[in-house]
Amino acid sequence: MLSLVMKILRKPKIEDIVCNIQNNEEDKEAFIVQYQPFIRKSISSVCRRYITEQDDEYSIGLFAFNEAIEQYSYKKGKSFLAFADLLIKRDVIDYIRKESKHNLVFLKEDEQEEMLEMQVSLTEYMKEIENGNRKEEILHFQSVLADFKITFSELAKESPKHRDTREHLIEIVKVIIKEEEMMEELFRKKKLPLKHIEPRVRVSRKTLERHRKYIIAMCIIFANNYTYILDYIRGGKHDE
């Protein structure tokens, strides 16, 4: 009886609310209004100034928060706000970078020289901001990995060292992420759906089990579209 009462009185989790309002524009709009202070705080951490509703960056942040609501699912980790914060900062950084390049094109020659000097400072500033955002992306990845009882040290130790092996495993990952049923089982049970994977790939169960942690990690990375981590992977770092 007590457990039933507690269940009724328990405040719904943000993540449950988000999943319930994804197809309801009125509820979604009310939710966005409720979290405007959070949106402003995320934008301000990038711009390092107070953000008003008249700022272009504010519109970018609102749109990114709306995208976070629409995209959020079990694949994005336990915290909706951590996921939304990533999207807001990423989009605001992209906007600032594009605007600085765009403004330079339409300036006179003497103004361009002055602008170029400003851009040197802006470039350093953007590097600093991106380093912070990269760190947050890695921390988000680490928290989702922890749900699967996988640590960074384990992943580093068990990741394949040879490029051809990694490429072959990525093909397996692509098979998994295209199948919603497999992804749902992966994130719900926190283990590879081997029974569904085996008939679709030309590798043994033993191979799948040996590279289990790497395959799971790649599924998490692609499902969350981690910008910086994906750039690192596509850059082919540490090939042998």
UniProtKB/Swiss-Prot annotation:
Please state how the activity of this protein is regulated. Negatively regulated by the anti-sigma-I factor RsgI.
Q: Which residues form a coiled coil?
A: none
| Keyword hit for Cytoplasm | yes
Give the domain of life. Bacteria
Stretch forming the signal peptide: none
Knockout mutant characteristics? Disruption results in increased sensitivity to heat shock. Loss of SigI results in a coordinated decrease in expression of all three toxin subunits.
- For the keyword Iron, the answer is no
What SUPFAM superfamilies does the record tag this protein with?
Sigma2 domain of RNA polymerase sigma factors (SSF88946)
Q: Where is this motif: Polymerase core binding?
A: 56-69
Residue ranges for the DNA-binding region feature of this UniProt entry: 194-213
Q: Which GO terms describe its biological process?
A: DNA-templated transcription initiation
Q: Where in the cell is it found?
A: Cytoplasm
Listed HAMAP family: Sigma70_SigI
* Subunit structure, interactors included: Interacts with RsgI.
Q: Which family does it belong to?
A: Belongs to the sigma-70 factor family. SigI subfamily.
Function, as annotated: Sigma factors are initiation factors that promote the attachment of RNA polymerase to specific initiation sites and are then released. This sigma factor contributes to both stress response and virulence gene expression.
> Know the name of this protein?
RNA polymerase sigma factor SigI
- The source organism is Bacillus anthracis
